[in-house]
Curated annotation (Swiss-Prot):
This is 3-isopropylmalate dehydratase small subunit. PANTHER family: 3-ISOPROPYLMALATE DEHYDRATASE SMALL SUBUNIT, 3-ISOPROPYLMALATE DEHYDRATASE SMALL SUBUNIT 2-RELATED-RELATED. Belongs to the LeuD family. LeuD type 1 subfamily. Keywords: Amino-acid biosynthesis, Branched-chain amino acid biosynthesis, Leucine biosynthesis, Lyase. It comes from Burkholderia orbicola (strain MC0-3). HAMAP family: LeuD_type1.
């Protein structure tokens, strides 16, 4: 998992409340057995004018010019600004995969759905909770200034705007540690690989019958 330390990026404002996971990545794209390739289908039903299906050449599909992520000023955005209860609906880890593979490193909103919130951390996507008043101000700034950027300093736990304003945010110490070091669940386990191998070697000596293959 990629480390998250300090990130500066263009902000894209998604001015909708209760954005659910089916809007983030529609159900037909969940058939894939891979963890990659979801970025082109993030917000598929809002992003394109036709119906999307797995395996399509998305470069040939008609774009919805009214959708915020299709507007030229937000191309290359890596910080998503959203409204309350972002990521609600059914549990699907594909949702943070799609957002991350689109190019987002962080999402700022007044609140998130719990399962989506946890899935973001497990996949290196930083969900930041700010107050509704702070989010309102950032929406106004993002719309008013072309190429509006924010800098997110995870170690300092602060979002910095170009006008000098700072927005502190809370994050659990363990989650912060994992993001700063790029540890997902597998990465955390592999830190103890030597001890795991030692345990398995000792177990094989002490309990050899556990490795006996059953015949018949």
């Amino acid at each position: 998992m990629e480390k998250f330390t300090v990130h500066t990026g263009v902000v894209a404002p998604l001015d909708r409340e209760n954005v659910d996971t089916d809007a983030i990545i529609p159900k037909q794209f969940l058939k894939s057995i891979k963890r990659t390739g979801f970025g082109p289908n993030a917000f598929d039903e809002w992003r394109y004018l036709d119906h999307g299906e797995p395996g399509q050449d998305n470069s040939k599909r008609p774009l919805n010019p009214d959708f915020v992520l299709n507007q030229p000023r937000y191309q290359g955005a890596s910080v998503l600004l959203a409204r309350k209860n972002f990521g609600c609906g059914s549990s699907r880890e594909h949702a943070p995969w799609a957002l991350q593979q689109y190019g987002f490193r962080a999402i700022i909103a007044p609140s998130f759905a719990d399962i989506f919130f946890n899935n973001c951390y497990k996949n290196g996507l930083l969900p930041i909770v700010l107050t509704e008043q702070q989010v309102d101000h950032l929406f106004n700034e993002t719309v008013a200034f072309n190429g509006f950027q924010l800098t997110i300093d995870l170690d300092a736990q602060v979002v910095r705007a170009g006008d000098g304003r700072e927005y502190p945010f809370e994050i659990a110490a363990f989650r912060k540690y994992c993001l700063l070091n790029g540890f997902d669940d597998i990465g955390l386990t592999l830190r103890h690989a030597d001890k795991i191998r030692q345990f398995e070697a000792e177990r094989l000596v002490k309990q050899p019958w556990l490795n006996t293959k059953l015949v018949g």
